Amino acid sequence: MSVACTIRRHIIEKLHVLNIDNFVVTNESILAKLIVDYPNNPDHGDLYTNAALILSKYIKKNPMDIAKILVDEFSSIKEISDINVVKPGFINFNISLDVWYEIIISINRLKEKFGHVNFGNGKRVNIEFVSANPTGPMHIGHARGAIFGDVLANLLERVGYEVVREYYINDAGAQIDVLVESVYLRYKEVLGENIVIGSGLYPGLYLKDIGKLLYQEYDSGLLGMDYSQRRRIIRDVSLMYLMKLIKEDLALLGIKHDIFTSESQLQKDNIVQKCVELLQEKQLIYYGTLDQPKGTEGINWKPRTQMLFKSTDFGDDVDRALQKADGSWTYFANDIAYHFYKISRGFQHMILELGSDHIGYVKRLKAAVKALSDGNATIDIKLHSIVNFLDNGAQVKMSKRSGEFLTIKDVIEKVGKDVVRFIMLTRKSDVVLDFDFAKVVEQSKNNPVFYVQYAHARVHSLIRNAPKILEIELVDFSVLSSKEEILLIKLLAKWQDIVEISAKTAEPHRITFYLIEIAEAFHALWGYGNKSTDMRFIVDNNINLTSARIYLAKSVGYVIASGLTIFSIVPLTEMK
C-alpha cells in the first residue's frame, strides 16, 4: 500500500469514530469524496487532505474550525511527523523520515513488483485498437493508436484485469470493392497489359505483389471468369495477403492481438439483423425523418423516411439512421452490431481506441452500448491525435508519388521499436505529438527516451563497480539526509499511485512523465557527486553510506524497469 493510501486509510478509521456536533461519518459516499494526495507545491508538505472541506457541507460548520478538530485527531497517526491547516480548510501533512526509508527497503525486497496493485480483480476488459482498413501495409500514422492501445492493455493487466486485445477487420465496406478493382489492374499489369490507375483507386506498388500471387495461382484464368467469382478470389487473396502484412507490421512494434473479428463474417452471421431486432423489442427503433445535417446547406438535400435508433434517449445529440435508401445497413448499424457482438460474448467493459477525427462517434456508440446492455455494459472511447513527423525540425513527407506512405517498418529500421514506443507515449493521447527523427536518437537530456534509459544504465554501471555492500537490514538509512536524496525517495514512493491513476484514467502518458521525473532527480543527484565527493554514491571508508546510496540507486533501477516493462520496452543495462 502506498504512503498516500496508508494515510487515507488511517484518516477514514479516525472519521468513523469521530463525533463533531453529533455528526458521525457513516455514509461511505461521503468518504468516497475524501482526497489524500500530493500537493503541487512541496513546500505545502508531503500530503494534503480535503477532509474538513468535505465534512463542512454536512456539519454546517466553518471548514477551518473543523480542520482544527481534525488536526487534533490526525496528530496521533504514527506516520505523520507534523500537520498544519491552510485556508480554506486544507490539512497538510509531513511524513516521518522513517516511513520514507522503509520505501527503499520495500522496493529492494519486491524489486520490479513494487507498486503492483490489484483493483481489477480478474474482471474482463475488451480493448479494440488499430483496426486499420485492410487495404495496405500499416503506415506510421497508425503507430500512435496501436502503441497506446497495447500499453493500456499492459497497464490494465498490471492492475489485475483480464484483457482481450481485439482487431476489427473492416472487410465489408466500399473500400474492399476499390481494393479488388485496384488489385485486378495490377494483375493485368503482371500479364503484360498497360494499365491506368484511375481516380479513387489505390495506386500503391505493394498491390503488384498481390497481382503476382494471383498470376502464379491462376495464370490468365481470372480474365475469363464471371465478375462475382473473380471478385471473390481477388478479395480473399488480397485480404489474406494484406492482413499478413498488417500483423507483421504490428509485430515489429511488439504488438499482438488476441482476436481478429471480421465485419463480413458478422454480416454472414446476421449479427446486424439480430441487433436491430433486439432494439425493436426494446422499442428503440422508429421510422422518421432527420433534420438536414449541419454543413450541408446549399446542397440538394431532401428529407426521407428512414429507420432510426432512439440514441437521444441515451445522451446522443440526434437519433441515428440504421438503413440507407437502398436498404443496406449504414456504417453505424454495422458498428453497433459489432458492439452487440462484444456484449453477447460477455464483455461488460469495453475500450475503443479511435483517431480524433472520429470524435462524432463517441456519443452515438456510448448510447448504443447503453441501450443494448440495459446500462450494464460500458464503453470508454479514447481518441488519439495526429503525429507530426520531423527531421531536425523540418516536416517529413508522409507519402510518395507511388502512393505509398512512410511505413512502420521504415521508421523502426531508422530508430528502433523501443524508441518509437516511448516517444508515442510522451504526450496525452488526444494532444498533437511531434516526432523528430533527429532528436529521438540524440544522446542528451532533451531526448526523454535516452534520459530514462541512461538513468537505468547508470544504476547498473554503479552496481557493477560498487564494493560489497551491507545486507539491507543492517543499513542505517538515516544517513540519506540531503534534500536531493529525500526528494528522490519521495518520488519513488509515488510509483503505486502513478500506476493506479494511470490505469483508472486510461492515461499511460502519466507513467512517461513520472519516469522522466525519476530520471531527472537521479541524474541531478549523480551530478552533485561530481561536485562533492561526500555526495557520491560510492564513498571511500564509509560502507554504511555507500550501502544506503546503492540501495537507493537500485530502487531507481527497479522502478524504471517496472515502468518500461509496462511499455514493453527493454530496460538497458548499458548504453551503446
Curated annotation (Swiss-Prot):
It comes from the Bacteria. Its EC number is 6.1.1.19. A motif ('HIGH' region) lies at residues 132-142. It catalyses: tRNA(Arg) + L-arginine + ATP = L-arginyl-tRNA(Arg) + AMP + diphosphate. It is an enzyme of class 6 (ligase). Keywords: Aminoacyl-tRNA synthetase, ATP-binding, Cytoplasm, Ligase, Nucleotide-binding, Protein biosynthesis. GO terms for biological process: arginyl-tRNA aminoacylation. One of its GO terms (molecular function) is ATP binding. GO terms for cellular component: cytoplasm. InterPro entries: aa-tRNA-synth_I_CS (IPR001412), Arg-tRNA-ligase (IPR001278), Arg-tRNA-synth_N (IPR005148), Arg-tRNA-synth_N_sf (IPR036695), ArgRS_core (IPR035684), DALR_anticod-bd (IPR008909), Rossmann-like_a/b/a_fold (IPR014729), tRNAsynth_Ia_anticodon-bd (IPR009080). It is found in: Cytoplasm. Monomer. Belongs to the class-I aminoacyl-tRNA synthetase family. This is Arginine--tRNA ligase. It comes from Ehrlichia ruminantium (strain Welgevonden).
